[in-house]
Amino acid sequence: MLLSLLIIIPFLSSFFSFFSPRLHNNFPRWIALSGIIATLLVVIQIFFQENYHIFQIRHYPNWNCQLIVPWISRFGIEFNIALDGLSIIMLIFSSFLSIIAIICSWNEIKKNEGFFYFNFMLVFTGIIGVFISCDLFLFFCFWEIMLIPMYFLIALWSDKTEKKKNFLAANKFFLYSQTSGLILLSSILLLVFSHYYSTNILTFNYNLLINKPINIYVEYIVMIGFFLSFAIKMPIVPFHGWLPDIHSRSLSCGSVEIIGVLLKTAPYALLRYNLVLFPDSTKSFSLIAVFWGIISIFYGAWIAFSQTNIKRLIAYSSVSHMGLILIGIYSNNERALQGVVIQMLSNSLTVAALCILSGQIYKRFKTQDMSKMGGLWSCIYWIPGFSLFFSLANLGVPGTGNFIGEFLILSGVFEVFPLVSILATIGIVFSSIYSLNVIQKIFYGPCKQNIKVFFINKQEVWTIIALVFTLVFLGLNPQKIIDVSYNSIHNIQKEFNNSILKIRS
C-alpha cells in the first residue's frame, strides 16, 4: 500500500492544485509542497521499514518492496512498481530538489498558479514513476507523461519579455522528447516481441526479460534504440540542442526541475535497463560509448567557456558532466558505477544551486549576459560567496560530493580504460577554466552598472544553505549513500557479468 502512495499522492496533488484557486490563490503552492513532502515521508517510511538493501543481496531482482497489479493482461502488461537501494536514493533526492524548486517558485509564479502547479506535480509524478517502474510499458508511460506538462512549464512560465522564443524553446524540447519516446517505444516492442517468439510468453515484466537470450543482432538494435532514447534526454553531444535553449528561457524553479531532476532519469535508465537487459551488446558497444563520453566532456567544456549567457553556460556545463557519467556507466567497473550515483546526486545539487543563484542575479539586473556584469562582489551580500563555493564544487574541489563522484569514476575507469581515464581527467581540468571565468566576469573587475548594495531574502538564503550542507555531507560522508546503493549497484554489475558468461558459454 505504501508503494502505491508514491504515485497516488503526487498525482492527486496535481488535480487538487488545479482546482484549489477557486478557494484561495495560495492553495496550489501549499498543496504541491504538501504533496511532495508527503511523498518524501512515504519514501523515508519505506526506507526504515523494509530493510530492502539487506534483502537485495540474495534475492535480486525479486524486490522486497514490490506491488504488482494486473493491468492489460492480454498483452502481458502489469502495474508493476518496486524499490531497491538505487531507486530509493533517487526518490529522496528528487523529492528534496522538487521541494527546493517549489520554494523558488513561491515569489516567481503570480498568474495561473493552479495550472502551473498542476503541470509541476505531473512532471514530478512521471519522475517518481520512472524510478520505480518494473514493467517496460509502464516505464514508457511515465517517461512520456512528463512531456506535455513540461512543455507548458517552458512555454508559459519563462522569460516574459520574449514569449515567441519561449514557445520556440518549448517546441524544440517537444520534438526532441517525442523523438526519444518514439525510439524507446519501438525498441520496447521489438524486445518484447523477440522475447515472445523465443519463449512464447508475451510480457513487459522487467524481471522476466532479464537473462532471456534473444538474437544477438536484434539485441544490438534494441540496445542502440534504448541508448539513443536515453542519450537524447541526458543529453549528450550531439543531442543536446534543446537543453541550452530551454534552460536560458526557464525560471529558476523550472531550471532546478529540468537540470536537477529530470535529466537524471536518463542515466538511471541506462544503469537499470541497458546494462542488465542487453549485456553482450552493451559490452561490445562500451568502447564507443566511453569515447562518445569523452567528446561530450570536451565539447561541453569548450562551448561553456565561450558563452556569455550565464544560464547557457550552466547548461553546457551539465552536458560536459553527463559525458563523465556516461563513461562511468559503460566502464564495466563497480567502483565507477558507485561514482556515477554520487556524481548524479552532486551534480544535481550543484547545478540546482547555480540555477537559483543565476536567477537571483537576473531578477535584480534583468540580464543573463556576463559581459554586462562585473564588480558585483561589493554590491550583493551572500550571492558571491555561494557562487564561488558552487563553482568550486562544480570543478570537483575536495570536501564536496562532486570530488568523490569524479574520483570514484576516474579511478574505476582507469582499471578498464586507462587512456580514457587520463583524457577525462584532462577534460575535467577545462571545467576549472570556465567555472573561475564566470566568477571573474560577474563578481570582480570594475562595476558596470550603477546599483545599490542589497541583501537577498531569508527564503533564498536558507534554500542555498540547505544545498550547501547536503553537498558537503555527500563530500564528507559518501559512505551513507554507498551503503544504501551498494547492493543494487553490485547486483547490476553481477547480472551484467553473469549474463555475458551465460551468453558466451
Curated annotation (Swiss-Prot):
Its EC number is 7.1.1.-. Pfam families: Proton_antipo_M. It catalyses: a quinone + NADH + 5 H(+)(in) = a quinol + NAD(+) + 4 H(+)(out). It is a multi-pass membrane protein. InterPro entries: NADH_Q_OxRdtase_chainM/4, NADH_UbQ_OxRdtase, ND/Mrp_TM. Keywords: Cell membrane, Membrane, NAD, Quinone, Translocase, Transmembrane, Transmembrane helix. Disulfide bonds: none annotated. Coiled coil: none annotated. One of its GO terms (cellular component) is plasma membrane. The chain crosses the membrane at residues 30-50, 86-106, 114-134, 136-156, 173-193, 221-241, 251-271, 285-305, 313-333, 373-393, 409-429, 462-482. Composed of 13 different subunits. Subunits NuoA, H, J, K, L, M, N constitute the membrane sector of the complex. Belongs to the complex I subunit 4 family. This is NADH-quinone oxidoreductase subunit M. It comes from Buchnera aphidicola subsp. Acyrthosiphon pisum (strain APS) (Acyrthosiphon pisum symbiotic bacterium). The gene is nuoM.
